[in-house]
């Protein structure tokens, strides 16, 4: 079985990644999507039938990671394939540095 994603987008900024995740156990797709929606820095854009999915051109200047096109990965027993995009200057560098620092300060203060 094969799960494939092909994307051709000429952009100056922002990264896109096709990510495959394999779980140890079976999972419920709706529950997985609900859990992603609960995460503060993740925005779920996942309705391919209505052409709603993350594009690099939409995320420039934003801190969040945008996730979509979530589907079962049939090349493994319990897996998914998803498309993620983020502003690589903000999420890949500046915002991540601030978030890491906040976590370290929080741990030091016992939060």
Where are the regions a protein language model picked out?
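NAD(P)-dependent Rossmann-like dehydrogenase/reductase catalytic/cofactor-binding core
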Residues: 64-66, 71-111
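C-terminal substrate-binding/catalytic lobe of Rossmann-fold NAD(P)-dependent oxidoreductases
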Residues: 1-81
């Amino acid at each position: 079985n094969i799960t494939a994603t092909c994307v051709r987008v000429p952009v100056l900024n922002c990264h896109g990644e096709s990510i495959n995740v394999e779980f140890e156990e079976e999972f419920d797709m709706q529950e997985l999507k609900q859990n992603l929606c609960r995460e503060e820095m993740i925005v779920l854009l996942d309705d391919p039938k209505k052409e709603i999915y993350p594009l690099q051109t939409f995320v420039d200047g934003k801190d969040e990671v945008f996730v979509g096109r979530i589907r079962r990965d049939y090349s493994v027993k319990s897996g998914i394939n998803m498309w993620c995009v983020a502003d690589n200057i903000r999420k890949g560098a500046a915002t991540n540095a601030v978030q890491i620092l906040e976590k370290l300060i929080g741990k030091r203060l016992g939060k």
